[in-house]
Amino acid sequence: MAKKSMIAKAQRKPKFQVRAYTRCRICGRPHSVYRDFGLCRVCLRKMGSEGLIPGLRKASW
């Protein structure tokens, strides 16, 4: 779980636009966040396997 202070800091508008970064909506993780879902890879995999994300299916080929 991310620190609450870091989550609050990320929500503020930065002085320079290039300093803005995404965080996971569920756990607050700053790395490997998928923009389409707003979730990190860990939460995306967990919620996807539980069937909580409509239209998301596990790939097999």
Swiss-Prot record:
Q: What is this protein called?
A: Small ribosomal subunit protein uS14
Q: What's in the keyword line of the UniProt record?
A: Metal-binding, Ribonucleoprotein, Ribosomal protein, RNA-binding, rRNA-binding, Zinc
Complex and partners: Part of the 30S ribosomal subunit. Contacts proteins S3 and S10.
* Record note on cofactor: Binds 1 zinc ion per subunit.
Which InterPro entries does UniProt cross-reference here? Ribosomal_uS14, Ribosomal_uS14_bact, Ribosomal_uS14_CS, Ribosomal_uS14_sf
So which residues are the signal peptide here? none
Keyword flag Plastid? no
Please list the cofactors this protein needs: Zn(2+)
Role played: Binds 16S rRNA, required for the assembly of 30S particles and may also be responsible for determining the conformation of the 16S rRNA at the A site.
- HAMAP family assigned to the protein according to its UniProt record, in alphabetical order: Ribosomal_uS14_2_B
Q: Which PROSITE patterns match?
A: RIBOSOMAL_S14
Would you identify the family this protein belongs to, as annotated? Answer: Belongs to the universal ribosomal protein uS14 family. Zinc-binding uS14 subfamily.
Note the superkingdom of the native organism.
Bacteria
